[in-house]
């Protein structure tokens, strides 16, 4: 039973989000780590993400039973009652929001609320089923965790937070479109209007390429804005160029789209993990803050 309650929270998604939270937190901390705050932020975000995933599982029950990848999920098979699941999801969310508010700051909590509402209320309940722009809207919720981590330390939504929001939102797009391509039949069977299904794989490839270019520009802004050092810059540039090269290889006539998309998806995880690690270890104070410190 415990295993089923864990599965419904989608542990893989929680873990992936924690990596980005750590990146945002340590970027803002600049080596001065408040460990109780760090732990509270990680636990708080984990609880909120878990809550969102459980609610998503409840909402997507009808869709999940039509998809090969999700047809054996806990709620599809009726292994946990709907009433208990809703209570479970609510308690997780309340605990997460409360922890962020008390142990971090109100801004971190409200950013978590924003991400939660977008994911559950806007994306899962409506956009995913009715609009090709669902992925775009959903990307905002996916970009919330690193911004929460950053703002838990800084207690302000500054240029650094905005750049993080851009980086992780833009990353979500090619990442999600790649999934939709190699899981094309699943999305088609469930009648989910993702771009590859609605507009075709060729159009999706064009969007993937453009979003990776935009992502590359956004990643460099952290260094150009003085938030991360040259080591991060080198890794960000290398990762972006490699990812773009992989995207461009998808235009070859002999390419197997499903194989190509899966490779692109796998590398997207490598890319965002690499950036999260590098912004953690190569953070620095923005130039204007260094100047103010010097003048004092």
Swiss-Prot record:
It is found in: Cell inner membrane. Belongs to the UbiA prenyltransferase family. Protoheme IX farnesyltransferase subfamily. The chain crosses the membrane at residues 11-31, 35-55, 84-104, 107-127, 132-152, 162-182, 208-228, 229-249, 264-284. It is a multi-pass membrane protein. It catalyses: heme b + (2E,6E)-farnesyl diphosphate + H2O = Fe(II)-heme o + diphosphate. Its EC number is 2.5.1.141. It is an enzyme of class 2 (transferase). One of its GO terms (cellular component) is plasma membrane. One of its GO terms (molecular function) is protoheme IX farnesyltransferase activity. GO terms for biological process: heme O biosynthetic process. PANTHER family: PROTOHEME IX FARNESYLTRANSFERASE, MITOCHONDRIAL. This is Protoheme IX farnesyltransferase. Keywords: Cell inner membrane, Cell membrane, Heme biosynthesis, Membrane, Transferase, Transmembrane, Transmembrane helix.
């Amino acid at each position: 039973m415990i295993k089923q309650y864990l599965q419904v929270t989608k542990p893989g998604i929680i873990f992936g989000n924690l990596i980005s939270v750590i990146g945002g937190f340590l970027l803002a901390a600049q080596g001065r780590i408040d460990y109780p705050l760090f732990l509270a932020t990680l636990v708080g975000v984990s609880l909120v993400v878990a809550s969102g995933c459980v609610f998503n599982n409840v909402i997507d029950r009808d869709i999940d039973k039509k998809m090969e990848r999700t047809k054996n999920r806990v709620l599809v098979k009726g292994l946990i009652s709907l009433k208990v699941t809703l209570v479970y999801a609510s308690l997780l969310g309340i605990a997460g929001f409360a922890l962020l508010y008390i142990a971090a700051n109100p801004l971190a909590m409200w950013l978590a609320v924003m991400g939660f509402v977008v994911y559950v209320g806007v994306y899962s309940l409506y956009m995913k089923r009715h609009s090709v722009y669902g992925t775009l809207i959903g990307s905002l919720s996916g970009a919330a965790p690193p911004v929460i981590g950053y703002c838990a330390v800084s207690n302000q939504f500054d240029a650094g937070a905005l750049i993080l929001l851009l980086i992780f939102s833009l990353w979500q797009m090619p990442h999600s479109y790649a999934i939709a391509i190699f899981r094309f039949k699943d999305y088609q069977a469930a009648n989910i209007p993702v771009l590859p299904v609605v507009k075709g794989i060729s159009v999706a490839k064009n969007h993937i390429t453009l979003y990776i270019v935009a992502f590359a520009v956004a990643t460099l802004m952290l260094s150009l804005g003085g938030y991360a050092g040259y080591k991060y810059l080198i890794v960000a540039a290398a990762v972006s160029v490699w990812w773009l090269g992989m995207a461009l290889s998808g235009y070859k006539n002999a390419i197997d789209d499903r194989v190509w998309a899966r490779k692109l998806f796998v590398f997207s995880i490598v890319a965002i993990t690499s950036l999260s690690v590098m912004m953690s270890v190569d953070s620095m104070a923005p130039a204007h803050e260094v100047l103010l410190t010097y003048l004092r």
